[in-house]
Amino acid sequence: MKPDSIRRYNVIGSRRISNYWWAIIIGSGGLGFLFTGLSSYLQFNLLPIIHAEKIIFFPQGLVMSFYGILGIFFSLYLGLTILFSVGEGFNEFNKELGIIRIFRWGFPGKNRRIDLSYSIDDVKAIRVELKDGINPKRTIYLCIKGQRQIPLTRVGQPLTLEEIEMQAAELAQFLQKDLLLN
């Protein structure tokens, strides 16, 4: 096997610093809201930094408790995506065997392992989608016969223009397929 006949790109998935950050911030905020709502119901402060004497339970305390519970649940959801490494995996291009393998981890259950394999002959082109603005989108797609387009880049933290151009050009050259810009 030639060392240059296989290319493998790892995908980070949900174990990004931003997800850890948001899980902690949203969880802390949710606990603060929940304790404030409960303090207004019980008519004494559960935490010394919360002063809920002037908050009446209905409707403010009830709404704060509701938002607190939602924040805690969302924080737990983010924590579970981090724990289970949802979205983590790799893209492997093997010219020797003539296959492309795309692997990702999902949530526990029957679809925990997402493992897709395609023949290199089924690939029509590599397509790059660039969209700038407040929410930039920079994605490399694998265009398969039958009008399927499979995203190859990670979600959430877009690559720089230079990185995405280099990776797409390198991949198109490696697979000897057309590179489409959109």
Curated annotation (Swiss-Prot):
> Which controlled-vocabulary keywords does the entry list?
Chloroplast, Membrane, Photosynthesis, Plastid, Thylakoid, Transmembrane, Transmembrane helix
Membrane topology, as annotated, equals: Multi-pass membrane protein
The cellular location(s) given in this protein's UniProt record come to: Plastid, Chloroplast thylakoid membrane
Q: Mind naming one GO cellular-component term on file for this protein?
A: photosystem I
Keyword ATP-binding (UniProt): no
* UniProt-listed NCBIfam families: PRK02542.1
Q: What family does this chain come from, according to its entry? A: Belongs to the Ycf4 family.
* Name recorded for this polypeptide: Photosystem I assembly protein Ycf4
